Structure formats: structure tokens, C-alpha cells
Amino acid sequence: MKINSIIIGAPSSSSGKTTISIGIMRALSRRLRVQPFKVGPDYIDPGYHNIATGRFSSNLDTWMSSREKMKEIFIKRSTGSDISIIEGVMGLYDGKQPDKDTGSTAEVARTLKSPVIIVIDISAMARTAAAIILGLIKMDKRLRISGVILNNAGSDYHCSIVRTAIEKYTGIPVIGCVKRSDDLKIDDRYLGLKTAMEDDNSGKIDKIADIIERSVDLDLLIKISKESGDISFKSGLFSKKNVNRVRIAIAYDAAFNFYYYDNIEMLKMYGAEIVYFSPLNDYKLPEADGLYIGGGFPELFAERLSDNYSIKKDIMEFFNSGRPVFAECGGYMYLSRGIKINGKYYEMASIINGESYMDSLILGYRNIRAESNNILMMGGWHVKGHEFHYSRLNVNANAYKTERGPDGISTKNLLAGYMHLYFPSNPRIPERFVRSCYNV
């Protein structure tokens, strides 16, 4: 199958990939059906993709799943779109290992046979940009680097001299030059960009798209996307049929929005109806057979979460009824007795007998093994995932074993921990969660 696609890569992080990507996505969405993707385990950038295109963004990660599963996700999500835009991660060749590009943007580009557009920040360089692009080309000649977008240019003249150098020494066309502008800035914080749900970002994305339309040859970009190669897959990840009809309530608001889209889609595949609720704004849980509270920034909304006694009471009653409750990272914090922040203490849902507090960053891919049977996994099952947080929770962890040690809490109807599990790495997990919800 041939899918028109573009991968947007860069020599390094902080080159402007996300800003340029969401601008291209929104600009193209004004005339085409655009399917967005994000390379790697990130949960924040896909939120901007969703707003930019009106379609949910999926993660493409060869370490957390496999090349075959990734191709299946890519083909399934791209069906019905005119073009797929894939935002890369870090530098083009940066992955999990120093001597291999596993999990990198380059590996994804090769696997999907997608042309690559390089975004390069030229704010502090001119002719040297050509040397950088030349190095990226020579590092792996199996890649199809088909265009360059210059970012953070100081003037039209700056654009002109860098364009001339790159096209002379590499033969690769410069398809756009974006000059520095305050309208291109997206606020960030310690875990990366602010989440797309924290502010009204649609207007901001429109301004970025307006700049992209003036600065990038989108017709040429569309033409390049049609150079994508044929791909097929042998996975069968989404070939399962409905198992049981259940309803799962998922927390989704400004405090909790770190989810892998394909996790939710796999729950649906096994028979779950998904209903959403807000621990910030709602006073009652919807009727449901299971509860899923994902990651996010509960520490930024601690006072509001603490003050919403009604929803906390409802969650406690739900848990005490014996129905399954699954929580990841920020959701894990929310289910604790409380969160300590800057000397203040905020009461949370009090399902877990422990308190959370802020500390140094913990970040990385994780191989995860269940220590015993729980609502999602049998003891000994493995799953891959990602850990990304600044908090700690003072409990005797007993749910998972990882390279860093134990994590999480597991009881008869509760599974909660810092790990963000990636269901496509073990499709038995969403099936078991649905069965757990059905069998209460």
C-alpha cells in the first residue's frame, strides 16, 4: 500500500520541529484531510496535532512495539486521509542506543518509506547549514531526504545565502524559510511544551499556519509526499473481535490528558465503550464498569482537584464497589492521599495509602513485568512503556518490576503506577482489562 506521507526531522531537539509540524498540519488541513503522527513516546505534541488537524495523532515507536505493528498502526490510521504528516523526535538519528538508530526518526522513515523534510535552526549559522544537511544525507543513504525548511532566519538575505549554500552542496531543495517571530512561540515548562488543553491554542495554531503558508512551498511538499514507497504489514494487531461489552470512564481534561491514542482504540476493539469525565470540572462519575485515569499535570491543578470533594467521593465509592481502577503517573498521584507542593499539602482521592511530592526528573523507556496477577496483566506478563515525571510516591511498590526497580500498587481491583503502558506491545493487556471490567 502506498500512503502519501512526510516525516519532519531535524539535526537536534529545539530546532522547531513541533512548531513547523503543527503549522504545516493546520495549513494543509485547510485543503486536505491530514492524519498526524508523532515518532516516539511523547504524549504532549500529539495534543497539538489533534487541534491542528481535527484528527487524533498516533505514536509511531519501533522500540515500544515493533516495525510490523508500527506499520499496521500507520496504515490503519492513515486510511481515509489525503496525506500523513509525521513529526520526528530529537535529532534525526537519535534513538535508544548510541550505535544503532532503534526508535529514531530515521528508522521510522526507512520502515515507512517516507520522504524526510529537515527543519534546521539557522539563527546562528549560514553556510555551515549545508555541512549539517550533507552529514545527515551521508549518515544513511537509504533515507530519502527530500527537502529542507530553514527556521529562525533573521532576514530575507539570511534565507537567500543559506538556501544557496544548501542547494549547491547537497542538491536538496530548500522548500521554505521561516523568519523568527513571536507568533511562532509555544510556551513550555519542565516536562516540555505546555499541554494543548491548558490554553486556547486553536487561534495560536492558526497564526503559525498563516506564517507557514507564506513561508513554505506547500504544493512542493505535497508533491514530495507522493514519492513515498509501498509498504505492507504482517501484524494483525487490530484483527481481534469484540470480547465483552463494557463501559470504561476515562479522565480527560487539562490535568489528565497523557494517553496513547492506540491504547484507547484497542480497548474499543475489545468491546469497550469509552466515556470521558473531568476530575477538575465534573461532580459525578459517569456510569461505568471500569475507570482509567492517565497521566498529566495534577500538581498544576492540585488546589482545584483537592477542592472537588464530590468527584473524589464518587471515585472512592467506585473503587469500594470492586470495579477495576487503572491509573498511570499523574493518575497515580491523584489516587494517593495527597500531593505536597512548595510546602503546601493538597488532599487527593485517598485510594492509595501514600503521599506524593516533587523531586528530580525520571525519564526513559521501560521494560515492565507484572509481579503478580492484576486487572490488566497476569503475573510474569511483559509490556513496554515510558516513564516521565518529577514526582515520587512514598509507598511499598508491588505492581511492576522494571530496570529501575519496583513500581506501582496492585490490589484486587486497582493497578496504578508511574509507568505509561503501551498496549500495542502486549495486546493481551487491553483484552484482560475489558474482561476485568465485565466480570465484576
Curated annotation (Swiss-Prot):
Pfam families: CbiA (PF01656), GATase_3 (PF07685). The active site is at C329 (nucleophile). The keyword Cell cycle does not apply. GO terms for biological process: cobalamin biosynthetic process. Pathway: Cofactor biosynthesis; adenosylcobalamin biosynthesis; cob(II)yrinate a,c-diamide from sirohydrochlorin (anaerobic route): step 10/10. CDD domains: CobB_N (cd05388), GATase1_CobB (cd03130). Disulfide bonds: none annotated. Residues 247-428 form the GATase cobBQ-type domain. Its EC number is 6.3.5.11. The keyword Magnesium applies. It catalyses: cob(II)yrinate + 2 L-glutamine + 2 ATP + 2 H2O = cob(II)yrinate a,c diamide + 2 L-glutamate + 2 ADP + 2 phosphate + 2 H(+). It comes from the Archaea. Keywords: ATP-binding, Cobalamin biosynthesis, Glutamine amidotransferase, Ligase, Magnesium, Nucleotide-binding. Its cofactor is Mg(2+). The record marks H420 as: Increases nucleophilicity of active site Cys. GO terms for molecular function: ATP binding; cobyrinic acid a,c-diamide synthase activity. PROSITE patterns: GATASE_COBBQ. It is an enzyme of class 6 (ligase). Catalyzes the ATP-dependent amidation of the two carboxylate groups at positions a and c of cobyrinate, using either L-glutamine or ammonia as the nitrogen source. Comprises of two domains. The C-terminal domain contains the binding site for glutamine and catalyzes the hydrolysis of this substrate to glutamate and ammonia. The N-terminal domain is anticipated to bind ATP and cobyrinate and catalyzes the ultimate synthesis of the diamide product. The ammonia produced via the glutaminase domain is probably translocated to the adjacent domain via a molecular tunnel, where it reacts with an activated intermediate. The a and c carboxylates of cobyrinate are activated for nucleophilic attack via formation of a phosphorylated intermediate by ATP. CbiA catalyzes first the amidation of the c-carboxylate, and then that of the a-carboxylate. NCBIfam families: cobB (TIGR00379), PRK01077.1 (NF002204). Belongs to the CobB/CbiA family. This is Cobyrinate a,c-diamide synthase. It comes from Picrophilus torridus (strain ATCC 700027 / DSM 9790 / JCM 10055 / NBRC 100828 / KAW 2/3).
